[in-house]
């Protein structure tokens, strides 16, 4: 089976600096796809850039943890604080899943109102990986709209949930440390037959990203990596085809996808990402009070 890879940059639309970083990475051949946040300050500019670069695959980065909702906050009270902004961090107890449905529909509609159509669906802070109920909502939306859903590293044992198209494998890692370049190279060399998604977060620092955060350094380091010719050159040298989510849209759902998400008896198994990403997820929930632990555990494929 041919080896193909989608390199997706998250957070398109977050800010002008992130937008510029993603476009520079795309022009350098370092990424093939991105995911758009429709409720963030850089959204209008990101839409213009998406029209300007039609070969860039742009999906919806469903956001429930940052900024203000697209819906009237009063209509989704379980998702917001008193000031109308999202509750930050992981999904809290007490969310009304009807509110999640409503906000996903509102974000989808804002995206399509621009004349663009999402090529895929994923979530900010990987909420559909960590929360089975959010996965259900997003899986139904992706299936009904005929777009792929980002593969989860957690096998949610669900019955009666449609199986949208998705990649065969996914690599969730960050590359903002001294060993990031070599780690990415090893990930590329280890790609197996089928379609794998690699996630990244390139971006230039700007006013929106000035708040002290471990992500600021990660974005700058990943920007340097994914705008270098090294990624495209490595893919060419090892015979891996860079593709985007439009290619996956045209493929029939794989047996792996159907078995994984239709089986009621499937065993729930969490496959850990590399340690830097896991640490950052925990820091987000704890308001980033702890420093980054750069220890690394062996990366494992999601299968």
Model-derived features with residue positions:
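Terminal accessory/targeting
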Residues: 1-6, 16-57, 68-116, 120, ...
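Histidine-centered divalent metal-coordination motifs
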Residues: 61, 124-126, 201
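DG-centered beta-turn motif at the end of beta-strands
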Residues: 9-12
């Amino acid at each position: 089976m041919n080896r193909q890879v989608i390199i997706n940059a998250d957070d398109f639309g977050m800010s002008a600096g992130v937008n510029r970083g993603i476009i520079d990475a795309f022009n350098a051949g370092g990424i093939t796809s991105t995911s758009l946040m429709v409720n963030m300050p850089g959204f209008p500019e990101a839409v213009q850039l998406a029209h300007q670069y039609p070969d860039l695959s742009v999906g919806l980065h469903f956001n429930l943890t940052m900024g203000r909702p697209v819906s009237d906050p009063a209509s989704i009270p379980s998702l917001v604080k008193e000031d109308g902004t999202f509750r930050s961090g992981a999904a809290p107890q007490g969310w009304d899943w009807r509110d999640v449905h409503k906000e996903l529909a509102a974000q989808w509609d804002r995206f399509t109102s621009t004349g663009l159509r999402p090529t895929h669906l994923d979530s900010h802070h990987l909420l559909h990986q960590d929360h089975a109920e959010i996965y259900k909502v997003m899986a139904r939306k992706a299936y009904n709209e005929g777009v792929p859903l980002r593969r989860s590293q957690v096998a949610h044992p669900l019955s009666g949930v449609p199986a949208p198209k998705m990649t065969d494998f996914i690599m969730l890692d960050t590359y903002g440390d001294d060993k990031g370049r070599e780690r990415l190279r090893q990930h590329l060399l280890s790609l197996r037959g089928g379609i794998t998604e690699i996630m990244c977060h390139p971006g230039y620092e700007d006013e929106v990203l000035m708040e002290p955060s471990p992500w600021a350094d990660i974005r700058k380091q990943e920007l340097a990596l994914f705008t270098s010719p090294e990624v495209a050159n490595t893919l060419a040298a090892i015979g891996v085809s860079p593709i985007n989510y439009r290619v996956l849209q045209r493929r029939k759902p794989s047996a792996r996808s159907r078995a994984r998400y239709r089986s009621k008896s499937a065993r729930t198994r969490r496959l850990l990402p590399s340690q830097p990403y896991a640490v950052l997820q925990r820091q987000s929930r704890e308001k980033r009070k702890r420093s980054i632990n750069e220890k690394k555990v062996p990366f494992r494929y999601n299968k």
